[in-house]
Amino acid sequence: MFNITNIQSTARHQSISNEASTEVPLKEEIWNKISAFFSSEHQVEAQNCIAYLCHPPETASPEEIKSKFECLRMLAFPAYADNIQYSRGGADQYCILSENSQEILSIVFNTEGYTVEGGGKSVTYTRVTESEQASSASGSKDAVNYELIWSEWVKEAPAKEAANREEAVQRMRDCLKNNKTELRLKILGLTTIPAYIPEQITTLILDNNELKSLPENLQGNIKTLYANSNQLTSIPATLPDTIQEMELSINRITELPERLPSALQSLDLFHNKISCLPENLPEELRYLSVYDNSIRTLPAHLPSGITHLNVQSNSLTALPETLPPGLKTLEAGENALTSLPASLPPELQVLDVSKNQITVLPETLPPTITTLDVSRNALTNLPENLPAALQIMQASRNNLVRLPESLPHFRGEGPQPTRIIVEYNPFSERTIQNMQRLMSSVDYQGPRVLFAMGDFSIVRVTRPLHQAVQGWLTSLEEEDVNQWRAFEAEANAAAFSGFLDYLGDTQNTRHPDFKEQVSAWLMRLAEDSALRETVFIIAMNATISCEDRVTLAYHQMQEATLVHDAERGAFDSHLAELIMAGREIFRLEQIESLAREKVKRLFFIDEVEVFLGFQNQLRESLSLTTMTRDMRFYNVSGITESDLDEAEIRIKMAENRDFHKWFALWGPWHKVLERIAPEEWREMMAKRDECIETDEYQSRVNAELEDLRIADDSDAERTTEVQMDAERAIGIKIMEEINQTLFTEIMENILLKKEVSSLMSAYWR
């Protein structure tokens, strides 16, 4: 790329061979030959790219030329993508082939400049030295370094990007004029940025653009660089050494340069396509996140100062035997680890190695660990000696058959008893009963152990789906059997088959009307593929523990059916029934909230029993039509009569107070509105967009920000971070207020017009 620092990146027209035809401009000649490569939707953007390539700006670099070719290739129909080539016959040679594979335009870069050939014409450009340009440019050195570069950058913009580049330049000018240290260029749709930005800028924010690369010669004194949610495929090795914090999450980066900024302390590369890390990462690095990439191995020696390492969701089969000695947080879940290093860092506080294939843990773990997650592995035992500082341990979904003998005597150093979660493991009934007995004793002071009810040692054979359905619909015709047999190829059909068999063993089958209810529901599923898909998904984890989890899953399926009916128009002509359906969903959400409160206060109870217990016991008092009558383990739910009385009162009060606002924002009601009042809906949405796009939204955000009076901190970066967090939170709040106002207004108008507004009055007396 042309180096602005030493040789100014401008060019001059040097020679022309074969006079240009005055009849048809080159860009039109080329376009006439390749217009068929592009759909009507992409024609304008493709034409702009061709115009650029036929007459590149003076500051054109190989990277910029390549980006235009990449853009054309992306816009073209797949059948013509290979007619647009770059790096052809060399890193800096680009060309376009006609439909019959004849070269009609080429651009070749060399050390002296570049040559454009097309339509029998050849134009060569050479670079101009900085002194040559300076002699012809008016203004100060600042004008050359900034205004000239920025104006050329704006001129190069594709049509749809030009206005946003102008906006970016205005922001840079504002920073330059007012000596601001933060430059925010996010959500502008930028495909490039100028290499030169105001030198006082220390924080550069480029999030949510369309950048495919960063400048090779990015200048300035940047300390913080954010370029999340772009289309970056690589990182230049020449980024300023001043950078201390860099976030490049949600891009397409495949590899890192061997050299990163030497001052780098924090690097976040979440959700990219990186397969390996450089051996020599910056020694100043303290925070490293490569969560959700494709990394197979880590460097043997990571920087010794790293305190937080996140390598979650990669393809690691092992961790380095020697990890940074000061490491406090290690997140390595969702990999293919089979073991951990024999010796872990002595100051480790958080260790997450969930969703791996680990069969055994080190017998001695660092005593400083407060949070340990080893769930979803292949462990058969837990260590006898747990870390002294342990506050919570998640070991669900392993192959544990016993608990450490020392567990009841473990005393953690924390203010609360340690919580050890071992749900969905194949414990024997004796192990569960012994743990229950120990924890129920008056003088027990050990950890709180939580596991799911039910016998995990029983292996249930999953029948073909059509056979499971026949258990409920005994009079099925052969045609119906074949229909359900065809459904067996659908995703999660086997899970639903197992669910149906298990449902037949629940307490609810004692009631004849329950079987009729399920039979009618199954006939509905046979006719509705979308509802069937939703129900099959819910069935995925329905049979992993006890009978009551199956019943709870059935409740969730009935709730999903109710919502599905509302969204698909079943209540469009029956708004009274829709409002009653909404009231039931509201009550169920309130029950879930209260159940979560109860679970937090319990010592040793399966949360399934608490959730189902409230639903089951409040079925009649709250008129819950989708709930079943019975459950098996209510006696161990920990729910008291006073809990039920309090829950009933709180839910009824909440419904009288809040249902009006809740219903206005309910998604299924919005679907109904779009169908029964399309004009009013469009007007309301237009009004909502206007609130956001005009000054009203930002003015309200600014007013609340000003009321907060965020004090200046001695740490300017910290003040900026607090300011940004506050602005984000206020923006969400203002948006929720706008939604509530507009959706409530349209709801009241439509219900009044339909003469059912009285149904929104307080329900409970």
Curated annotation (Swiss-Prot):
The active site is at C546. It catalyses: S-ubiquitinyl-[E2 ubiquitin-conjugating enzyme]-L-cysteine + [acceptor protein]-L-lysine = [E2 ubiquitin-conjugating enzyme]-L-cysteine + N(6)-ubiquitinyl-[acceptor protein]-L-lysine. It comes from the Bacteria. Ubiquitinated in the presence of host E1 ubiquitin-activating enzyme, E2 ubiquitin-conjugating enzyme and ubiquitin. InterPro entries: Leu-rich_rpt, Leu-rich_rpt_typical-subtyp, LRR-bact_E3_ubiq_ligases, LRR_dom_sf, LRR_E3_ligase_N, NEL_dom. PROSITE patterns: LRR, NEL. SMART domains: LRR_BAC, LRR_TYP. Keywords: Host cytoplasm, Leucine-rich repeat, Repeat, Secreted, Transferase, Ubl conjugation, Ubl conjugation pathway, Virulence. Gene3D superfamilies: 1.20.58.90, Ribonuclease Inhibitor (3.80.10.10), Secreted effector protein SifA (3.30.2440.10), Shigella T3SS effector IpaH defines (1.20.58.360), Shigella T3SS effector IpaH domain (1.20.1270.130). The keyword Secreted applies. GO terms for biological process: negative regulation of protein binding; protein secretion by the type III secretion system; protein ubiquitination. One of its GO terms (cellular component) is host cell cytoplasm. Residues 1-451 are annotated as: Interaction with target proteins. Residues 464-758 form the NEL domain. Its main location: secreted. Binding to TXN is inhibited by hydrogen peroxide in vitro. LRR repeats lie at residues 200-219, 221-242, 243-262, 263-284, 285-305, 306-325, 326-346, 347-368, 369-389, 390-410. It holds the Pfam family LRR_TTSS. It is found in: Secreted; Host cytoplasm. Its EC number is 2.3.2.27. Residues 462-765 are annotated as: E3 ubiquitin-protein ligase catalytic domain. It is an enzyme of class 2 (transferase). Residues 452-461 are annotated as: Linker. Belongs to the LRR-containing bacterial E3 ligase family. Interacts with host TXN. This is E3 ubiquitin-protein ligase SlrP. It comes from Salmonella typhimurium (strain LT2 / SGSC1412 / ATCC 700720). The gene is slrP.
